[in-house]
Design a protein with these regions (language model features):
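Residues at secondary-structure transition points
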Residues: 23-35, 55, 59, 68
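Hydrophobic residues in beta-strands and at strand termini
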Residues: 15-17, 64, 110
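Hydrophobic beta-strand-centered segment that forms part of the acyl-chain substrate-binding groove
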Residues: 44-74, 79
């Protein structure tokens, strides 16, 4: 995975599709698609944090819209809502031709720095 771009409330991750990521039909495994989407959403959420704070995924829901057969996927994570304890993100996973492959919404839990 490669972090392509980060702005306040937004992050873009790309990932080359490799044989090791395939499920038995030859498509990218849903777990890998989820990991890419979660990573983009996590980076987007991290842009909203105060110094010393961290975030982890509390829950996520993903819709797989098309099988991933492209050589590369691009995941764009965007913050929908940022509160003191929870950050809600939405990530869209697309192929190189801009076809939507998956859509994820996730809740990120904010962890305060140790005292």
């Amino acid at each position: 995975m490669k972090l392509e771009h980060v702005d306040k409330g937004k992050a873009v991750i790309s990932c080359e599709n490799k044989k090791e990521f395939s499920q038995y039909l030859g498509y990218m495994h849903g777990g890998m698609v989820s990991a890419i989407a979660d990573t983009a959403g996590g980076h987007a959420a991290a842009t909203m944090l105060k110094e010393g704070y961290k975030t982890v995924t509390s829950e996520l829901k993903i819709h797989f819209l098309k099988p991933v057969v492209s050589k590369k996927v691009i995941a764009t994570g965007e913050v929908l809502s940022a509160g003191k304890r929870l950050i809600i993100v939405e990530t869209t996973v697309r192929d190189e031709e801009d076809n939507m492959l998956a859509k994820m919404i996730a809740t990120m839990f904010v962890i305060e720095p140790s005292k």
